[in-house]
Amino acid sequence: MKRRVETITFDGGTLEYSVTGKGTPILVMHGGHSNCYEEFGYTALIEQGYSIITPSRPGYGRTSKEIGKSLANACRFYVKLLDHLQIESVHVIAISAGGPSGICFASHYPERVNTLTLQSAVTKEWLTPKDTEYKLGEILFRPPVEKWIWKLISSLNNAFPRLMFRAMSPQFSTLPFQRIKSLMNEKDIEAFRKMNSRQRSGEGFLIDLSQTAAVSLKDLQAIICPVLIMQSVYDGLVDLSHAHHAKEHIRGAVLCLLHSWGHLIWLGKEAAETGSILLGFLES
């Protein structure tokens, strides 16, 4: 995928970002372990005349971790990015652990946000220090360990793509692999391999773990733009209560429950439906 990758510096902090496609601007808040090279769902949007701006969130890629001292501070930098690009307002798509960033941005800068789409998104406190996943995340996905973890995953995935998909996909789903197999698309294996090749945690995932509780009811209730919430009923990473929580507290929000095989709603036999629902929302 052709994209322009650059950085801007403001108040001593560096923000890395990419721009791909030409047309109506969309600002994407990527999920955990990702960066400005994210590409899930991008092709369909670009083909329909959208330009996608993806900042590496704090601690990911070349973006300074200091920018992420709070969600509000990070959002100041996203505003500066739009100013730098001379963009008045954008559609915002917030994915998974990027949910809190999208919610904060839409609630604090309503004049800059045309619509907000939450995809498999965290919308309230997620993992806590009491959770096994939190403890494992702190050990495995902190520098410098995370670098070697992702190198190992990437190497294994490149060598044994089908085996790794079979081993790892159930972590993203509440379904056993045999059910996933019936819902998957053959292209999912390559998309999954590419995902694992581009992922790194940097300092970003630890920041994500520490900030999910920072999303308040006040933030959700302050959002005034049209909102679409998309999540699979089989999501194994983010509980469905997050989607229902957002629906309950954001005025006029539309909840769309999907039947894709898990957290990665851009994969599987339902992927085309995911794309068409999003495009229909953006164009309405």
UniProtKB/Swiss-Prot annotation:
Alphabetical list of Pfam families matching this protein: Abhydrolase_1
Active site: S96
Signal peptide, first to last residue: none
Keyword presence, Flavoprotein: no
GO molecular function: hydrolase activity
EC number assigned by the record: 3.-.-.-
Keywords: Hydrolase
Lineage top rank: taxon: Bacteria
Enzyme's top EC category: hydrolase
Classification via SUPFAM superfamilies: alpha/beta-Hydrolases
Span of domain AB hydrolase-1: 25-123
Keyword Hydrolase: yes
Family statement: Belongs to the AB hydrolase superfamily.
UniProt-recorded name of the protein: Uncharacterized hydrolase YcgS
